[in-house]
Amino acid sequence: MADWLFFVLLIMHWKLSKDFSSISEIDLRAHDALFDRLLHVHLQRNHLFCLSPSEVVALRRAIQFGPQALHVLSTILRRAQDYAASVGSATRHAVLMPLGSAVREPLGKEFYIKAEDASWWLEHPPSLYVENAVSDGGLYNFILSSGLRSLIGSPKYLMVRPFHGGGNPLGSVMEALFDERIQGICICDRDDACAVPPFPKDTTSEQAHVALHKMRVVDAQGQSEPRNPFFSFKITHGWGVENYIGPNVLNLFFNSHLEACTSRSAFLNAFPDFPALSETEANEWFSINFKSVTQDAENIERGLSGRFRIAADSTRCGLLAGLSIPKSVIPFVIASAKSGRHHHELLRAFDRDMRINIYRNAVRDLTQAAMDALAADTQMNFA
């Protein structure tokens, strides 16, 4: 039975519809409980409530908030520009409409939610669903936050809270505990040369896709259904989470763990200029199943020819198939990402990996999905 983890994450960016600027103060006060709730979950880092300075002034004037809510409004006012930039970086966000509004279809980045329905969304925040609680969860936390720092300059509006759910398979857990209301991101290992259904039988990706399709969250091709725009089903760019360990990060591990010299020699045999990789070698990196030293060389060849149109002989594929990343690499990355003598070296190694085109694109794909669903102000304080 596979371990699974979900991160209790932040739902999405919330904005107010322009309709609020044209209603009376009396009508605005009718929303006081909802605004108080939004400010509370913003303080709890469960949502990112984005208001313009004029909207903050209007709410303060019309509604008598308590000290805690006023504190949150002051923070939102002070960081209004930063929040606006965060909204701009997301591909979609929620727009709250006043009570009694007509139903509106999504338009561009905007997904419209009536005030009457807002509590439903607030009570069902999204999560990041992955396999293998401690290892996968910790590594994705590092990849997402570092990717955000590298791509837009700061990870402070992305927050991850781990929650270990036990040993049940990911697909059955999502199906048993959630329904079409599920929000967030599910990331599964590819475990194949192909990234679209049908997935290999009895793999996490196959079981998760079957469950999500039954829940009417994704279609037969694994794409999000329009009825639920705040859920993404993602398949790793390589065979698994291990492929997101770039060559420079792996080289840092080898430099600090001399006992892993045998593994390092294998990578040097396959990539003579390691950790530097040519474009072809970088594509090969994402075609290797680093979890296993018994990968079939034919799978490597199928991935290279099918995904990258690269012709590789059987000898080369056999050499690549014998590579594996030591199990202690992921714990090393997770520990160094927090603190320790290798912390800054790790960040520099990650930045070097981000100069590799295929690696940067793979991280950007996950980071964009995270920005859509996992927005939060991690600098909020409870004073």
Where are these regions (language model features)?
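Conserved, well-structured beta-alpha core segment at the onset of a catalytic domain
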Residues: 2, 220-222, 382
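N-terminal extension/subdomain marker
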Residues: 2-107
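C-terminal structured domain segments
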Residues: 45-59, 63, 287-362
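RecA-like P-loop NTPase motor core
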Residues: 82-194, 198
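TOPRIM fold recognition
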Residues: 191-197, 224-256, 314-318, 324, ...
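Short, flexible/disordered intra-domain loops and linkers
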Residues: 195-207
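Activity-critical C-terminal alpha-helical subdomain
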Residues: 204-328
